[in-house]
Amino acid sequence: MWAINELGLEHERLDYGHGHAATNTDAYLAMNPMGRVPALVDGSVCLFESAAILRYLAATYGNEDFWPRDLAQRAALDVWAEWGKNTFTEAVLEIFVYDVRLDPENRNPAVLDKAAQKVTALAKALDTRIGNGPYLCGNKLTFADIACGHILYRYYELDWPRPELPNLKLYYEELKSRPAFSENVMVSYEDLRGSY
């Protein structure tokens, strides 16, 4: 939804999963056979998986800054998009599961310590990269920022021994100032607490 709003696309949002409409209906499974969110229908195009949806939106509706036509420039952005989604996000989600999803009596501090070390190392690399900013790949918001930047809301909202990283903090503040980020990313996850 963040990308859809950044691109200024007219859309109809339908909420599915966790307290919303069921994802195991025939109608939803026709959109996403895995029965998970997200799914996107754009005319005759039906997609699932967030990275595929983001790339489709960027390629179809993005301008040259958001989705470069030059393949080498696009690949440079794609590296950070993939790193953000597959490396950084996955690491932050380990802390999310510990801090939010686990019941307090099921928490092991050693698990948090290990996850925090991993996330800290990755966040330091991201802080260094952002030093070239203000965005992940330069002066303009790109699809890489959406693939990587969304997890910063959880990174900063979770209770863990987070390092002080000035470039990363400025980047997060820049993202928070964007209405599409604050409206679509900065949503409460309180109803997920203590699920395991």
Predicted features and spans:
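Short Asp/Glu-rich motifs
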Residues: 22-23, 174, 194-195
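Short, solvent-exposed turn/loop segments enriched in Gly/Ser/Thr/Pro and often Arg
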Residues: 17, 143, 188-189
